[in-house]
Swiss-Prot record:
Highest taxon of source: Viruses
UniProt name for this protein: Non-structural protein 3b
Pfam family, one: IBV_3B
Length: 64
């Protein structure tokens, strides 16, 4: 026979752990916002990772 009390208790523990994990993820995201345009640039239909600030000197011609 299934022990429903144990199943419910285990489920509650899992829900608490998931809730804690989501709160942690939320706090990390709110303090460390990731801006992809700080590390990459969109050119010619592709995203390119920037090696340094010199890579984004702005002397490239914009072509659609």
């Amino acid at each position: 026979m299934l022990d429903f009390a144990a199943i419910i208790e285990t489920g509650q523990q899992i829900i608490q752990q998931i809730s804690f994990n989501l709160q942690h993820i939320s706090s990390v995201l709110s303090t460390e916002l990731f801006d992809p345009f700080e590390v990459c640039v969109y050119r010619g239909g592709n995203y390119w990772e920037l090696e340094s600030a010199d890579d984004c000197s702005g002397d490239d011609e914009f072509i659609e």
